[in-house]
Structures are given as C-alpha cells and as structure tokens.
Regions:
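N- or domain-start disorder-to-order transition segments that initiate the globular core
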Residues: 1-3
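Short acidic, Gly/Ser-rich segments with clustered Asp/Glu that frequently serve as metal-coordination loops
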Residues: 10-14, 22-34
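Active-/binding-site microenvironments in catalytic and ligand-binding cores
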Residues: 18-20, 36-44, 50-53, 201-208
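Generic secondary-structure signature for well-ordered alpha-helical cores
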Residues: 39, 43, 47, 59-63, ...
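Acidic/Gly/His-enriched mid-domain segments of enzyme catalytic cores or analogous surface patches
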Residues: 48-136, 142
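Long, charged alpha-helical interface segments
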Residues: 79-96, 100-106, 110-116, 130, ...
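Short, structured loop/turn "capping" segments at alpha-beta junctions
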Residues: 138-146, 174-181
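Glycine-rich anion-binding loop/nest that anchors nucleotide
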Residues: 146-152
Length: 214
C-alpha cells in the first residue's frame, strides 16, 4: 500500500484518481457528522462546493435534504446544519443528503476521481482502517490511498492532521509505505492516546470556534 496525504485540500478532482481509495477528513466536523448520518440510515451523500448547488439538487431530487453550513452556521433554506445530533434516524433514514460545508465539501470533491471515497474521523477510525486493509470489508486491501484533510479556510488544522497521522501510523503497521512530505508530516502529528485526541480537538482553532457558537 502507498499512502499520500494532503494537509489542505488541493483543487477539485486532483487528489488521487482511478485506482485510488480516497479518505476525506474533516473532524470538526463534516466527516464526523456524516458518519453519524450514515450510521442512522442515510442512503446517499452528495457533496457540493456551493450552497446554491445543494439547494438546486434538493429541489430536483424527491426525498433529498439540503445539509451543511457556512462559517459554522446553518444556511438559509437548508434542512439541516452540521451537528451530528440533527441527523437522527427518523430524519435521515433512507434520504439523500445534498451536503455543502465550508471546508469538508472541498476535501470530498478533491477526491472525486478516486474509485471510492471514505469519510474519516476519530468516531469511525476503526471502520475506516478495516475498509482500507481488509479485502472482505470491501476495500480490497487498497494499493493506493489518498488522504485529504479539510483544514480550515485553506489552512492547516491540527485535528485533521492528528487523525491523518493516526491513520498513517496504523497503515504503516499493516505494511503501508508513506509517499511524500504530507504523509510524513501527518505521521508526526499522530496523537498518543484518547486524552491527547480530546485535548487537540478542544484546543484547536476550529474547536474553539464551534464552542463559541454554542
């Protein structure tokens, strides 16, 4: 396995490509929220760069919901924001989610040419790892893995780098080779344990911003 990491999103469609499995990371909090949505039965997640695109898709697609945020707040006309608590089974089960967020959507769309794109966060860390390394999980012991961190407004974010680092460390333990400075830098940010994860998330710039919004 070869693993590459982008600590901030490259342009749309330029990360990975055919033959790659992509992992989009936005710990705070698109990929954490959408993990909850998937666990609660959401049928499909469609990322959009612009909120207007998500609204048009929602209006043209029976049963779809427009979801996400701008600058941490729900968008006017959207059905849901970007908190996992909004994505209860009775709300999202069987529904298609048109999702547009400030940072997370950019990470997902950067990977759109990959054969498959996973959403990664600490809340589903074990499931992501298993999908990447175990053939029976559907990942097929991925030969090429491209990881994109959402960052914050085009800047590095500690919480995303921490999860990317955790994933790199776990993949190296399974025989993977890190390719490029991004992957090596992410590995250097791998957290030491659960307490360090919590502190990194709470003290990150994005974590402090979300806390200020209540």
């Amino acid at each position: 396995m070869i693993v590459r990491v982008h600590l901030t999103p490259p342009p749309r469609g330029t990360a990975g490509g055919p033959g790659f499995v992509g992992v989009a990371i936005d710990v705070l909090r698109a990929t954490s929220t959408l993990t909850a949505a998937s666990a609660n039965g959401a049928a499909r997640i469609v990322p959009f760069a612009e909120t207007a695109e998500a609204l048009r898709f929602r209006d043209a697609t029976p049963g779809a919901l427009a979801c996400g945020e701008r600058d941490g707040r729900i968008v006017e006309g959207f059905d849901l924001g970007n908190s996992p608590f909004e994505y209860a089974p009775e709300v999202v089960s069987g529904r298609t989610l048109a999702f547009a967020s400030t940072n997370g959507s950019r990470a997902m769309l950067a990977l759109e040419r990959c054969d498959r794109v996973l959403l990664g966060a600490f809340v589903n860390a074990s499931a992501v790892l298993s999908t990447l390394v175990l053939p029976e999980s559907g990942g097929g012991a991925s030969a090429a893995i491209e990881i994109v961190c959402a960052g914050s407004l085009g800047r590095f974010s500690y919480e995303d780098a921490a999860f990317a680092g955790w994933l790199c460390r776990a993949l190296v333990a399974q025989g993977a080779t890190l390719d490029g400075e991004g992957a090596k830098s992410a590995l250097a940010h791998a957290p030491g344990g659960a307490d360090e994860v919590r502190l990194r998330v709470e003290r990150s710039q994005h974590g402090l911003m979300l806390a200020s919004l209540g």
